[in-house]
Amino acid sequence: ISGHRATYGGGIYLDQASIYIKEGGIINDNQATKGGAIYTEGTKAGSCLLNIEGGTISGNCANESGAGIFAICSKGTRDDMKVEISGGMIAHNYSGTGENLEENAIVLMGEDPNLTEDTGFADLYLSGSPVITGSVTLADDYCAADSKNYSPLIYVHNSFNVNKPILISPIHG
């Protein structure tokens, strides 16, 4: 999947559905405002699963955020948006413009002004030996105002092999 442009999900827009990316899958040279390669959303009306077992996500751009993957759970529960990565490569994807350009692999987000411990967020599950370069951003528009500081979670399975340290960065508000 290459050379596409969109507001959300330059290569793939996934809404309340599941997709599996296997060895040989290539998503490159796509552009969007959010989710240069992939934009995926789960809600309480329907869950979403992005499962990456292989393939390459590279050379994608996002004007705002999530050049590789932008995953959001909108007013759902904890299990409504999962990103599972066990293989493949996510590298050389860039968000922003000019001097604000940065390598950004994944943005995980929740969107619900009524935060509780059951509030849904896009959560990341890591296992195997994927290559991920650039930042992984945990974001939420409502967390800063809430003293409980709920946020997206990253689950790391004991089979996860770190090829290179992954930069985790929070964004609130």
Predicted regions and their residues:
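N-terminal accessory interaction module
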Residues: 172-173
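Glycine- and aromatic-rich loop/turn segments at beta-sheet edges
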Residues: 97-98, 102-103
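Surface-exposed loop/turn motifs in large extracellular/passenger domains
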Residues: 2-5, 12-31, 39-61, 69-95, ...
